[in-house]
């Protein structure tokens, strides 16, 4: 059958944005084999997410296209995670435009829809220019999406307060967000006069979302119903919660993974799993506090830690803890979290990690760094009650001991596990045949099937 439609998929190639977008595209492509999906991202991103270990199979109607990452010749990464993002965003509109023209030339089929990471707000202008629908995908939680929609109002309401007063205020004027304080907000949201490309990107996104045909969200209806319904009714956004996108069914279990083998030897709910994502690790003093506490208490642990970060661990720590702990440079996180030996997940509270902890019924110790992570951590502790945050946002030996004992050994920790268990069942129900996320996916698929009809 000749393809009748051509969807341009524009990815944001940093953090864990591109992988869930590809998961969604792969599912759409399987359900709509007569649609071409041209997937645009940077070459390094494509190499990573199109690896055969990440998905069971990639649809034959999905074709990846590499776009320039925007970094100047001879660029050397300074360590600031915002730096490569801003280079990419500066060049992104022209780069994506050129790449889409190449895809049209290759396929002989004009673009009939733009499916993009929600960060790429300029896709709204592209879609208007060529007269096709724009469907942004928000890969984080509904709570953080809502905050970006209300950026101007939040800035206006807090303008009269000084810094100390702001810190005590909550976002009680937006339904479902009364637990969020000003100090939890993403830095880019509150930087009113910032000329940061990333801050401007997020602001523009919030202003452009009303132009979307639908907004697909990597979440499920039952976790934030008040927020989702508010976005639909008050902001007139066609929110389609279609998550969790990354489930065990969408990843291949490693056949011979050393950390999974090690977990099989551990007692149920006894192991601390530590991973802070792919972008940043705690500073050296916090790494030392974590390590010292784990060693002194002899708490079994599995730590996903890149080789270059191990220099911040106490000398000979790995050797001294080898009988009850394990450090690996990479871990298959979903399969680790589903193992019954895991008792708690020490995490930065990125949304993918938070969703995975819910889907695998593991309570959380949150140490957020930037972006939506502080918002997620607040929801984890005070709204969903499935974990605890680190006081002051800093691991000390005393604080590490407190949070580990709270989650692993106290009645409060048992309540957290019960709460996350209830959320897990709701997440599982959402992706069942008649679940809310499945119905929303079918609504999204129907929008694609209407293309060129």
From Swiss-Prot:
Entry's Gene Ontology BP terms: anthocyanin-containing compound biosynthetic process
EC number: 2.4.1.115
UniProt pathway annotation: Pigment biosynthesis; anthocyanin biosynthesis
Annotated residues for binding of an anthocyanidin: 17, 148, 371
Glycosyltransferase listed as a keyword: yes
Molecular function in Gene Ontology: anthocyanidin 3-O-glucosyltransferase activity; quercetin 3-O-glucosyltransferase activity; quercetin 7-O-glucosyltransferase activity
Pfam annotation, one family: UDPGT
Residues involved in UDP-alpha-D-glucose binding: 139, 331, 333, 348, 351-353, 356, 372-373
PROSITE patterns the UniProt entry points to: UDPGT
Keywords: Glycosyltransferase, Transferase
ATP-binding in keyword set: no
Annotated catalytic residues: 17, 117
Catalytic activity: an anthocyanidin + UDP-alpha-D-glucose + H(+) = an anthocyanidin 3-O-beta-D-glucoside + UDP; delphinidin + UDP-alpha-D-glucose = delphinidin 3-O-beta-D-glucoside + UDP; pelargonidin + UDP-alpha-D-glucose = pelargonidin 3-O-beta-D-glucoside + UDP; cyanidin + UDP-alpha-D-glucose = cyanidin 3-O-beta-D-glucoside + UDP + H(+)
Primary role: In the presence of other necessary color factors, this glycosylation reaction allows the accumulation of anthocyanin pigments. Anthocyanidins are the preferred substrates, while flavonols are only a minor substrate in vitro.
Similarity section: Belongs to the UDP-glycosyltransferase family.
Name of the protein: Anthocyanidin 3-O-glucosyltransferase
Organism: Gentiana triflora
């Amino acid at each position: 059958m000749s393809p009748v439609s051509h969807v341009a998929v524009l990815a944001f190639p940093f953090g864990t944005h591109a992988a869930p977008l590809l998961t969604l595209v792969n599912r759409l492509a399987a359900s709509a084999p007569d649609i071409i999906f041209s997937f645009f991202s940077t070459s390094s991103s494509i190499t990573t997410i199109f690896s055969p270990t990440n998905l069971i199979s990639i649809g034959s109607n999905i074709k990846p296209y590499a776009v320039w990452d925007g970094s100047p010749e001879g660029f050397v990464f300074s360590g600031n995670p915002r730096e490569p993002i801003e280079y990419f965003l500066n060049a992104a509109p022209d780069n994506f435009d050129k790449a889409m023209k190449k895809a049209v030339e290759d396929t002989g089929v004009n673009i009939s829809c733009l499916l993009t990471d929600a960060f790429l707000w300029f896709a709204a202008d592209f879609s208007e220019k060529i007269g096709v629908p724009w469907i942004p995908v928000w890969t984080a939680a509904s709570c953080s999406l809502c905050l970006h929609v209300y950026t101007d109002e939040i800035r206006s309401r807090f303008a009269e307060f000084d810094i100390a007063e702001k810190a005590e205020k909550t976002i009680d004027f937006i339904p479902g967000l009364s637990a969020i304080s000003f100090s939890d907000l993403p830095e880019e949201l509150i930087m009113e006069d910032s000329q940061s490309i990333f801050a401007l990107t997020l602001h523009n996104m919030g202003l452009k979302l009303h132009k979307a045909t639908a907004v697909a969200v990597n979440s499920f209806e039952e976790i934030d119903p008040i927020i989702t319904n508010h976005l639909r009714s008050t902001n007139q956004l066609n929110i389609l919660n279609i998550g969790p996108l990354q489930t065990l069914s969408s990843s291949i279990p490693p056949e011979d993974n050393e950390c999974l083998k090690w977990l099989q030897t551990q007692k149920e709910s006894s192991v601390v799993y530590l991973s802070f994502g792919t972008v940043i690790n705690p500073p050296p003093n916090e790494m030392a506090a974590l390590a010292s506490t784990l060693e002194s208490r002899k708490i079994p642990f599995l730590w996903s830690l890149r080789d270059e970060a191990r220099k911040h661990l106490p000398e000979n720590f790995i050797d001294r803890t080898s009988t009850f702990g394990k450090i690996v440079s990479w871990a298959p996180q979903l399969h680790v979290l589903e193992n019954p030996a895991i008792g708690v997940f020490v995490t930065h509270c990125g949304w993918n990690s938070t969703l995975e902890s819910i889907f695998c019924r593991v309570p959380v110790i949150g140490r957020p760094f930037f972006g939506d992570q502080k918002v997620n951590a607040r929801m984890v502790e005070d709204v969903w009650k499935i974990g605890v945050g680190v006081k002051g946002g800093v691991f000390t030996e005393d604080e590490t001991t407190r949070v580990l004992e709270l989650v692993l050994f106290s009645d409060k920790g048992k309540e957290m596990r019960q709460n996350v268990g209830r959320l897990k069942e709701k997440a599982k129900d959402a992706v069942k045949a008649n679940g809310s996320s499945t119905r929303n996916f079918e609504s999204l698929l129907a929008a694609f099937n209407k293309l060129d009809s």
